[in-house]
Amino acid sequence: MDSSNAIFKSFLGKAPEWYKICIIAFLVINPLIYFFISPFVAGWALVAEFIFTLSMALKCYPLQPGGLLAIEAVFIGMTSAHHVKEEIMANFEVILLLMFMVAGIYFMKQLLLYVFTKLLIVIHSKKILSLAFCLSATFLSAFLDALTVIAVIISVGTGFYGVYHKVASGNSFEDSTDISNDEKIITNKEILEQFRAFLRSLLMHAAVGSALGGVMTMVGEPQNLIIAGQAEWGFVEFLLRVLPVSLPVLICGVITCLLLEHFKIFGYGARLPRRVWGVLARYNLLKEQRMTQQDRVKMGIQALAGIWLVVGLALHLADVGIIGLTIIIICTAFCGITDEHAIGRSFQEPMPFTALIVVFFTVVAVIVDLKLFEPIISYVLSADPHSQLALFYVFNGLLSMISDNVFVGTVYINEAKTALESAIISREQFDLIAVAINTGTNLPSVATPNGQAAFLFLLTSPFAPLIRLSYGKMLYMALPYTIVLSIIGFLSLEFLLPPLTELMSNWGWIITR
């Protein structure tokens, strides 16, 4: 084997050859487009290529191919290293969240697995169980960040999967085995596939639930805080102003959840196999029998840490990541986890994704520097006031499907604020536009993992390949929710928001500044 073959073989490891060739082609083509055709076209090509690397997440983790494309983009001048740093610092809260909050949830896994195992064993109806997961995620994400909620659900799902996988592989609950290795599973393969389908559906219901809750409050999503800040709204006012859109969407989202389970379409409807239920019930019974006073105290500490988590985030007592760090300290200190290697394991899951997010911010910097969204923004602001709400919603939704909704929301609200300060739009129109931007970035963005950081985290988590949740599968399973949420959001924005906002203003519930 000559050196060139050796380099090609080691390049991107076990990724398919056609995929490696694609990435090399992108790296060759991008500078040519940038220098000889158009920087604008090159920018959109980079966005499309980055989306491609995300869609192939199960073939190769997107950090390496996406990172190479991002490095080249900076090198050829599509953006600067300084601007990348500015984007990272502007979104530093998200990085802290990924580093510390997800690791903090790791130390609450014992309590979460106990509670959700009870839920799984007690609730036999798949419809009710799906509804419970969806509404739990909705409620939690209204007060916590949606990414934190998904981290909780992933932690629980991994626990369930690990318990059954060990037994199906012929091991006991206590054995330490590789749950990604199916070689020892011979007779239980069909049951395992059904269990995977069951977990996929629960996870997607919860993921959409996190978006339903995230749109409702100013702490639900990072961009909500930015929008609330620009509009000068408090927690209650934000909730009331968005309610004419968020409430009908929530009701229709819940109905969609039940209908999908009833008709068993779009990958939903898989029931928990009876044998798996038996294993989980046996595991739960064994755990309860072996539970010592010390175990109960540990779960009590984790419960108190959970209460602090909800209160701290709901009242915004500190940045999300800082609260996550306090969770790590409290849980490890009072549960006796002082070994650095044991603590280090909690960071194994979030760190690759944190690195990927930084690469993503590089792409965002390219979008800003090359003004890729500027033609769309100019078109929307030049439209007549009656059409502006619909256009803001539609274009926010479309761009949020391919780009980060935090970025899209921030760009649009800043442009709307500039238009207000320039007297292009009235204050009343600005308030309505702010709601359109909030709902436009949060609702249609469930269509793809690109738009919501929580969805992207789920797709690139180690749990996704275990349950065979690919990019295409996520698109397919999110499709009915995307259609319902987007249409109901649009209709509510057009026909309910203006009259109900005026009504609440007349009642004195909200004020026009």
From Swiss-Prot:
Keyword Heme belongs to the record: no
Membrane topology classification: Multi-pass membrane protein
Pfam families: NhaB
GO cellular component, one term: plasma membrane
Reactions it catalyzes: 2 Na(+)(in) + 3 H(+)(out) = 2 Na(+)(out) + 3 H(+)(in)
Subcellular location: Cell inner membrane
Transmembrane segments: 21-41, 64-84, 88-108, 119-139, 143-163, 202-222, 243-263, 299-318, 322-344, 350-370, 389-409, 477-497
GO molecular function ontology, one term from the record: sodium:proton antiporter activity
UniProt main location, coarse: membrane
Keyword Cell inner membrane recorded: yes
Assigned keywords, A-Z: Antiport, Cell inner membrane, Cell membrane, Ion transport, Membrane, Sodium, Sodium transport, Transmembrane, Transmembrane helix, Transport
Protein role: Na(+)/H(+) antiporter that extrudes sodium in exchange for external protons.
Family statement drawn from the similarity comment of this UniProt entry: Belongs to the NhaB Na(+)/H(+) (TC 2.A.34) antiporter family.
Name of this protein: Na(+)/H(+) antiporter NhaB
Origin species: Actinobacillus pleuropneumoniae serotype 3 (strain JL03)
Taxonomic placement: Bacteria, Pseudomonadati, Pseudomonadota, Gammaproteobacteria, Pasteurellales
The gene coding this protein: nhaB
